[in-house]
Amino acid sequence: MTKYFDINQPGYSIKCKIMGENIRELKKVILYCHGFGGHKDTKAAEHFAEAALSKMKKTAILIFDWPSHGNDVRSKLTLEDCDTYLSIVLEYIHNTLHVDDVCAYGTSFGGYLIMKYLHDHDSNPFRKIALRCPAVSMYDIIYQRVMTDENKTMLTKGKDIQTGFDRKVLIDQSFLDELKSEDIRHWDYLDFADDIMIIHGTKDEIVPFNEVKEFTENNVIEFVPIEDADHRFQNLDKMKLAHSYMIEFFKS
């Protein structure tokens, strides 16, 4: 069963999608946090749901559009809005779905936002966290690998820019300044490390493999390299392998 719905609070309307057999009898929710320029209908989430729901009963996969992504109505992306969206969705899972066992699957920008959330709130709302190709160096990735020279010129003139890959996102200089100052590589995650696993492709062309490996070593986080996988894990067999590791981790 797949259901689309909105979580509405004053000033916010978060576009969500939930996949599961019987949403009224849930014991576990895995919150999928997509990457920069992504959306709630990402194929990776569907592949994961298909594999996970066949192995975990009374479980649902919930995915939502980050601010300024997918069908979200916010015009410009801010880290503050991302934090608020994640808080609202977590509140919905606990208070409306009445589920206490919440895990997280974050990819790329979504992985960055999950780790930022742990630091900013000094707590972990998830029983387990599995990240695929997390953008630990988010500022460098946006500025060096995503933005065009024209984007950079427009920013110097005080203009907002549309940037991204397949789908563009509206950002401004203040967003970049925030990313630069909110560098998760400078923060300590040792208190949360036992409940985190990071999977990364050795051929990731967006998020440098060695940067993520170093991040996991510094924080004693379980690290699973996938040979020859790119950033999006476009090879379905490699995606299935990554998901198999995640599913066992979430079941533990």
Label every model-predicted segment:
Residues 26-35:
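Short beta-strand element of the alpha/beta-hydrolase
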Residues 34-39, 202:
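Active-site glycine-rich loops that stabilize anionic/oxyanionic intermediates
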Residues 106-114:
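Gly/Ala-rich beta-loop-alpha elbow adjacent to hydrolase catalytic centers
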Residues 67-99:
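Catalytic nucleophile-loop/oxyanion-hole region of alpha/beta-hydrolase
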Residues 37-50, 210:
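The serine-hydrolase catalytic nucleophile loop
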Residues 49-71:
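Conserved alpha/beta-hydrolase
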Residues 77, 112, 124-215, 219-225, ...:
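The alpha/beta-hydrolase serine catalytic core
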Residues 1-23:
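N-terminal cap/lid segment of alpha/beta-hydrolase-fold proteins
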